[in-house]
Amino acid sequence: MKQTKYIFVTGGVLSSLGKGIAAASIATLLKNSGLKVSILKADPYINVDPGTMSPFEHGEVFVTDDGAETDLDLGHYERFLDESLSQDNNFTTGRVYQSVIEKERRGEYLGKTIQVIPHIVGEIKDRIKKAGEGKDILIVEIGGTVGDIEGLPFLEAIRALRLEVGKNNAMNIHLTLVPFIKAAGELKTKPTQHSVGELRRIGISPDMIICRSEKALDRDLKDKIAISCGVEKNCVIESVDAASIYQIPLNFLKQDILSPIAEILDLKNLKPNMENWDSLVKRVIAPSNEVKIAFVGKYVDLKESYKSLTEAIIHAGAALDTKVELKWVDSEKLENMESSEVFKDVSGILVAGGFGYRGVEGKIKAIQYARENKIPFLGICLGMQLALVEFARNVLKLKDANSSEFNEKCQNPVVYLIDEFMDTNGEKQIRTAKTPLGGTMRLGAYKCDIKEKSLLAKVYNEVKSVKERHRHRYEANPKYRADFEKHGLIVSGESKGLIEAVELNCHPFFLAVQFHPEFTSRLEHVNPVICSFIKAAINYEDN
């Protein structure tokens, strides 16, 4: 069997430098050169997965087709690679220890003392190898920063794995910061030198260094980094701040990043076709038109919480040659503001998902304003649930209508806890209010049957069903379906009795979906729900 080649990506100096974007950009170039490529993110934190972590703590939780709750970098990987990944493409320290302890309890280690080396490191290596099966190249991003104590087993694993697979089958890329000191008026390389020194003390010598900076590096500075860090001169690549993350693969290509990669990994004919990508990026950066959308959410102070959704909107803008300006609206603050003043200058209102009661009434106000004023509206996940609550209160006149998530004793729970459903493997899942939170939601891609001649059918080009990804614990209560439909709120999508989408039949564009369309949107293949909403907003502005 052909040996998979590995590219290990580490980061130094500080976090949030963009290792995920760099890894995804290299993967894009390799894939467009005709290679079978995949990416894995190894996260050193102790949580089993990010599913129960606060958006303020971790940012978005990205969900794969098979229902894995993963790091937001997997979203970048999918959007750049234009491929669906799985739970094999992300694991944490918590997951590794959980697996090793379970094996120990089953007696699989035959009574041996369980240690970080070889058992924990061995488990990490096994997971990396599994993710690379059947691929020409596996890119492995190690989360965190070199020097973090929790990352040591992961660095030991990639050090050992490189020795195991041999020369020309693995390489190390290190991403560092080259800060610009305004007072001195120059870029400083010392943090990079120290970071590489720290990496070497662990036993890893980088083959390539990618330098994050707000300004371009001149040739002398690159040569200085190459000499002091022991890499070839053509292996010092700059990653300067860009107008769009989708420029990064093109910027890397201009610096001929593939030549040293090809030489180190013994690869031939790396000539990526990036024409379509380049065309779309130009429309992202310099579109012909512009439209403004209100983005209503409770985590608007941390935009990373909605990463996939904001990227999907960029994809739609590129497809429609339009810059989509987002007006961020804090749903909690909206509760005490005048809707007409907040939404007077927008051509569409998007109500995003979320958890917990804070900011809910503000979202309901936004939905009511969109419905009554015929402004294009899209509700996602909680946005759909609250569209039902708003309609029940203001049209059906059920003033105490609510979700049982926010009021367990309400008399009209138009949204309630899903107590029984079939998971993505076809197995029955039973839930109660006391079920532990971790990994117990309705997660992953489920088939949605679409009502003929509906707005949703038009959005999806008249197909009978689609598969979209979910992440929710509560669901529309079918007990109220007849009343909703009698008054014009139509169920246009469902999945084995669960309501997946609703729409208003007397509104230019009022669509709410239980699933997350943003999780399947890519630059080269935008999700139809997001694209149709932006198109409706453009039409609203034109008219």
Swiss-Prot record:
Superkingdom of this protein's organism: Bacteria
Gene: pyrG
Taxonomic path: Bacteria, Pseudomonadati, Campylobacterota, Epsilonproteobacteria, Campylobacterales
UniProt function note: Catalyzes the ATP-dependent amination of UTP to CTP with either L-glutamine or ammonia as the source of nitrogen. Regulates intracellular CTP levels through interactions with the four ribonucleotide triphosphates.
Residues given in the record as CTP binding sites: S15, D148, I149, E150, K188, T189, K190, P191, T192, Q193, K224
Species this protein is from: Campylobacter jejuni (strain RM1221)
GO molecular function: ATP binding; CTP synthase activity; glutaminase activity; identical protein binding; metal ion binding
Renumbered residue ranges of the record's region Amidoligase domain: 1-267
UniProt catalytic activity: UTP + L-glutamine + ATP + H2O = CTP + L-glutamate + ADP + phosphate + 2 H(+); L-glutamine + H2O = L-glutamate + NH4(+); UTP + NH4(+) + ATP = CTP + ADP + phosphate + 2 H(+)
CDD domains, alphabetized: CTPS_N, GATase1_CTP_Synthase
Full protein name: CTP synthase
Binding positions (Mg(2+)): D73, E141
